[in-house]
């Protein structure tokens, strides 16, 4: 089953930011106060979500090098320092001591699984690995020179034709879990083709 149980989830101490913490931006004599927010690892950010609505101004950040697209308790990334963490756990630790399904469980449910939970999760995924009958013929429609990611993407899209009940744009939590398990199970099978 899992190689881990050496993995440990680290609590990340996040600096408290109060409502009084703001940044002032002045352009052409007009000043706006924008809230300061703290990220998952104490990095500070200016929340500019209201800037355009309040002033008509936008920001420019080529390549989004200084832009966080959302707040996330799932992933922390700092490319300059070579840091990637999932739920506070360094990716190197997950790669060395964890499995694909343990990491998936961590990302989905927010914590590393206990042995019994991992066994149930592994079983649920393994029960869904086979592809629908006839789907293999779609591989023959792809050029032999197709990029692997293009082929995988196309095949994932084709899966939705076989599972129309899983394409609800507003799924219940149970249905969402069903979709996640199906994709976790079938993507390695698709990639193996």
In which residue ranges do the predicted regions lie?
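Hydrophobic alpha-helical bundle cores within soluble ligand-binding/oligomerization subdomains
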Residues: 5-193
